[in-house]
Amino acid sequence: MSSDPVPSSFEGNPQFEEETSLQKFRRRLKEEPLIPLGCAATSYALYRAYRSMKAGDSVEMNRMFRARIYAQFFTLIAVVVGGMYFKTERQQRKEFERMVEERKSQEKRDAWLRELEIRDKEDKDWRQRHAAMEAAAAEAGKKTAPHDAARSAIERSEEKSIGVLDAVKELLSRRN
């Protein structure tokens, strides 16, 4: 399995990189500058209406409330037109984000598989070492040296749970 990421049509395009929230805010401000302008106009109209109300100027207050309605309408139109204009770009961005998530999940899966392969290899190595040690022990058990004869007699006698004196007698009887 290759650890290279899946090739993408978005690679090399600086527009489609993971971005911070501040970068996203700046990008959205540059993409649709009319929406913040409409929000600012609405806020200014409300501020002026509030000041007129405090001053007691009802004519100016009514005029500013109408200006607020116009500014909100302008903002709403900017949102709708901007949404229609940037629809394809948003779809591309969603596709890019989906591919990024897919790549990350594939990398996690590959790392998990590598870890499983490493553990499996370690387990096989341990089993081979253990089998080799058992084979060496079995091989050593078949070749008994003369000085091991006494030991094997004692071991056999221990299996029968006889005493030391009986084991020595058995050993002497074998040599004669």
Curated annotation (Swiss-Prot):
PANTHER family, per database record = HIG1 DOMAIN FAMILY MEMBER 1A (PTHR12297:SF3), HYPOXIA-INDUCBILE GENE 1 HIG1 -RELATED (PTHR12297)
What name does the UniProt record give this protein?
Answer: Respiratory supercomplex factor 1, mitochondrial
Q: Name its cellular compartments.
A: Mitochondrion membrane
- Region spans: Disordered: 129-158
**What species is given as this protein's source?**
Aspergillus oryzae (strain ATCC 42149 / RIB 40)
Assembly and binders: Associates with the respiratory chain complex III/complex IV supercomplex.
Major subcellular site: mitochondrion
| Entry annotated with the keyword ATP-binding | no
The record's section on InterPro entries has: Hypoxia_induced_domain, RCF1
